[in-house]
Amino acid sequence: VDAAVKAKLGKSIPIVEDCAQSHGAKVGNLRAGAQATIGCFSFYPTKNLGALGDGGAIVTSDAALAEHMRNLRQYGWTKRYLQERPGGRNSRLDELQAGFLLVFLPLLDERNAKRRAIVKRYMASGATAIHAQFAQSDQYVAHLAVCTVNNRDKFVENLTSEGISTGVHYPYLDTDFPTTKHLPPMPLPVSEGAKSRIVTLPCFPEMTEDEIDLVCAAIEKNNSFFEAR
């Protein structure tokens, strides 16, 4: 985002920052969502700051743009019943969701730190290919503990036998979807190779020490799957 902002060079090019998985992340003194024209956050229940159901927020330092967004989220009204903004919809965050988020917001930094601590434990146990090591800041939020392994199916089978759940984030590229098949073909050998080797380990603040120890022991037992090939 910093590079995109600098490349703006005074031109009026809006920059939209996707913050859906980076609640609380910091680079230097800047939080995620603070640099771009607007930052977009998801409050889906599995996010680092999640509501009870679907929800989200847009942040901006532009007062006029903020007012425009407020109009759009409520039918395009500029005042009660006067619909002046095209593209408006009913997308208000209801009070129950907002109240739940306000309870968890003060805990966000603490919960992110717990996620980072879990990732560090995994790395110390031998998960050398865990992607968090490439974060630009030590204030990354460890939304997912994604790593790269050889023979993913066997690795997953081994962890499952130990009672450990895993996931794949994500199993498809945009170019795999029928909706993009009309576009010119684009060779993506690195991405194609990665999607068959990535696996996500459990990583959430509610994990107990025993659960973390269990995953670490499984990583140590299956260390050979992390060797580069």
Where are these regions (language model features)?
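PLP-dependent aminotransferase class I/II
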Residues: 1-4, 26, 61-229
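Proline-centered loop/turn at the N-terminus of a beta-strand
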Residues: 12-14, 38, 165
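A cross-family glycoside hydrolase active-site/sugar-binding cleft signature
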Residues: 16-18, 42, 169, 202
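Glycine-centered loop/turn positions within well-structured domains
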Residues: 30, 47, 143
